[in-house]
Structures are given as structure tokens and as C-alpha cells.
């Protein structure tokens, strides 16, 4: 057994093999203000305001500090206030990780309790750099704790380690213990940072064919756990906003088949705001329906007097033509508190466009000026209604 990584997630009474390393970059040197929900909006930077953000899942996946800083500086220059990025990168076998960066290892044969943390140069230090640079450039982060999908260590690595699957994961004791211990590690490491906007339970959690109570109970329990660790920062679910109306039209977004009920989950007191995503092409809808989806979630947010965030949206082609109407609906017709396009793209000196995808909006392009720069300006100048 090669104990290259420090041990986390140990059972009560067990002693860690190594002492947790301090952050590799300066953290905790930014402003004292903590973002919070105020009615249907957010107070950020000491002001209740609308704002735009972006997704950039790959920030911590870069091995070069200069490239991380380049991306963060361009995001800040755009006028974005918040970046949603992965707070996880996990593997089962550290001797053959299959990816350049990994923060966590799930393997019961290597670690008591099953969870190890990589403190090497391609481990948690990469996220330290992201958090430190976010502080320096005065932007905030939504850190997501797990992935419903298999990319870069999702539920699949828990399945490999503990025998759970995509639906039993939410109630599997070993999986949930390791998941909570990882949350505890991340929250305790960064809760003193001014760069944290919110903690997020997962990226697009689903439980296909399950009763919505499975996700609801899991989200209620885990969000309460996070609030015990950190009473200051917000917590979100990270779901796609699926709806379960009793008399729905039976189509995918309204049939509850993914086991997620956006309305029910918004009732959870320890979730500070709701999230919804939009990918009409993948879901079997026409693009014009997207604006209706935005309006529906805005109306639900009004009912609960909670912020809702249009947290992901994208198309594989004709970005400006297809996505701009959704942005204009958000700006002109709703009180959606913020929106985060999927996703920020740039050309990096070493990595190039390695981590982009067909939805990426690349810095410096004509479409970026419209969908990123102009939209961030529109959201920033939008007036918050007086109550």
C-alpha cells in the first residue's frame, strides 16, 4: 500500500496517517462581506443586485498557474461576478488516474473509510490556486461537490468503491459517509475565503425512476449538514429544475421521470436558492420553448420568495441566435436573480481549447461580446424592484 495521499473520511476513533496540508496558495485575504439571499435576490459585494456569471468547470483541472490566472482575469474583465466550477475531481486508482488532476481517491483497500485526499502538485493544490485567484480578482465561486455524470469522478467512482449505483447512491451508507467527509474537508478548507458564493450539493443530481422524496430527503439532510459546518455561506442543490405538475403535459421536463421535483425541493429551508438548467435540443424541445421554461421557474421563485438562478444554458450551434432570446427574457420579463451561461471558453497557451465543448462561448469572439460582455452589463444595470 502506497500512502501517497493524506487520509480523510476515517471512522470515529481511527487516527489519520498524515496531517492535512495547509492551502498551497494564500486564502482568506479578500473582503469580509459574504453573499446572501435577500428575498428573491442576492446581496453580493454589499449590494442587492442582479448579476451574470458563468460556468467554467475546468479551472481546477489546469496544471499551470498562469493559465488559471489568465482564465480568471478574463472572466473578471467580462463583468461576471460568479463562476460555477467543480469542487471535485475523483478517481479510484491513484496509480492509474486517467486524468491530469484529482482531488479525491475513493478506495477502501487503500484508505480506512474509503476516502483519500491528494495533496500532491496535481491534487487539491489546484483548487487552492483557483480560490486564491478568485479572491485576488474579486470574483466568487459556486463549488460543486459531486457529479451525477461519470466525467472526472462522479457517482461512478462511489459505485466502483462501495457498490452503489446511480439510484441507490443517495441512500447508500458507505457512499454517503465518504461524500459527507469530502464535503467536510472542502468546506473547512475554504469557508474562511471571501471567494465562496455558495456550496452546491451536486451537478445535476438525478434519481431516474425514483420517487422525488429520495432526492428531497437527501438534499434536506445534506444541506442541513453543510449549514452546521458553515453557517455563513449559501447552499444550493444544483439540479436542472425538473417539474412534476399533477396535470403536466407528459413530456420529459414535466413527467418527474428523473426523480427531481423543483417545487418540492424549493421548500427546503437549508437550500438558499433554486437552480434550473436549459438544453432544449437534448431534452426534445424546440428552442423557443426555452423562454417559457425561464418564465415558469421565475413564477415558482416568486411563490416561495426565494432567488432562482438560471444556472446552465447552452446550445451546440448558432449560440447568439438561439441563446440571446433566453437572455432577453431573463432581463426584461423576470426577476431571475442571476444566470450562468454554459460555458466560458478561452484559448490557453498550453492547453489550447482542450477543455471546451460545443456549447463554449470563447473570450474575444463576436458572440462572446454579445452573450457574455453585453449580457453581464445588462444584468448589472437592471434595477431591483423596491418592496
From Swiss-Prot:
It catalyses: Random hydrolysis of (1->4)-beta-D-mannosidic linkages in mannans, galactomannans and glucomannans. The active site is at 204 (proton donor/acceptor), 312 (nucleophile). Pfam families: Cellulase. GO terms for biological process: mannan catabolic process. One of its GO terms (molecular function) is mannan endo-1,4-beta-mannosidase activity. Keywords: Carbohydrate metabolism, Disulfide bond, Glycoprotein, Glycosidase, Hydrolase, Secreted, Signal. Belongs to the glycosyl hydrolase 5 (cellulase A) family. The keyword Hydrolase applies. Its EC number is 3.2.1.78. SUPFAM superfamilies: (Trans)glycosidases. Optimum temperature is 60 degrees Celsius. Optimum pH is 6. Monomer. Glycans are attached at residues 107, 165, 286, 318. One of its GO terms (cellular component) is extracellular region. Its main location: secreted. Residues 1-24 form the signal peptide. It is found in: Secreted. Substrate binds at residues 86, 203-206, 240, 279, 283, 342. It comes from Emericella nidulans (strain FGSC A4 / ATCC 38163 / CBS 112.46 / NRRL 194 / M139). The keyword Signal applies. Disulfide bonds join 207-210. This is Mannan endo-1,4-beta-mannosidase B. The gene is manB.
